[in-house]
Design a protein with these regions (language model features):
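Low-complexity, glycine/serine/proline-rich disordered segments
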Residues: 1-89, 99-102, 106, 110-112, ...
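Domain-level detector of nuclease and nuclease-like folds
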Residues: 69-211
Length: 211
């Protein structure tokens, strides 16, 4: 499979997830190509690099992420935001440790677009020293977050404990102006692997995983 390619087969959708799934399916390849070329969706230009801590702005006294910026945490995880200040990508080499949680940020991330059964999901888990703040959080279905996503994190943690390196690239995909991703593309390498492994999750119970 070519690097970054996505294959989806045999998944049946109904109800409120159908529209979001269709929009996501149509846009994933464009999204990946845009990010790999250094662009930010909706601008045609690359993100502006800022120092970690400078990725925030204030809107009516509320902290938000700046649009079209790139920031790197002290742990070495690099993120970009899109033209609407949503986390558009994150990547880095994982390291085991204890990140600090922000329970308030986890409860409110996504605002009005958040669903009742969502968690504040960490793109880089706290067990990998991921930030507990909005710069590393998205609204994520709780069953996905605690199920298939957690299984993947456990696979990475086990590899690190075995002495292997783990590198990840995570791309949330959004529809319209929503701050809630409707799907995720996750690519990762373990050890000295040449090719990226690929996981696709839809932001629904069970992740509707296609492999």
């Amino acid at each position: 499979m070519p690097d970054g390619s996505v294959v989806r087969t045999g998944t049946n959708y109904s109800g409120k997830f159908q529209e979001a799934h269709d929009a996501s399916k149509a846009s994933i390849q464009n999204r990946i190509s845009n990010l790999e070329s250094g662009g930010v969706k909706g601008t045609g230009e690359g993100p502006v690099k800022v120092n970690y801590g400078e990725q925030y702005a204030r809107e009516k006294r509320k902290k938000i992420l700046k649009p079209n910026v790139e920031y790197t945490s002290k742990e070495g995880y690099t993120y970009t935001t899109d033209s609407q200040g949503r986390v558009a990508s994150c990547e880095g080499s994982l390291q085991l440790g204890d990140g600090k949680r922000n329970n308030y940020a986890q409860r409110v991330v996504g605002g009005n677009d958040r669903l009742d059964d969502d968690d504040g999901g960490h793109l880089i888990a706290t067990i990998f020293k991921g930030s507990g703040n909005m710069d590393n959080l998205v609204p994520m279905n709780s069953n996905l977050n605690r199920g298939e996503w957690k299984k993947l994190e456990n696979e990475w943690a086990n590899a690190l404990n075995d002495g292997d390196k783990v590198r990840v690239k995570i791309t949330p995909n959004y529809s319209g102006n929503s701050k809630r991703p409707d799907s995720f593309v996750i690519r990762y390498k373990i050890g000295d692997e040449d090719r990226w492994r690929l996981k696709n999750f839809d932001n629904v119970p069970g992740g509707k995983l296609d492999e």
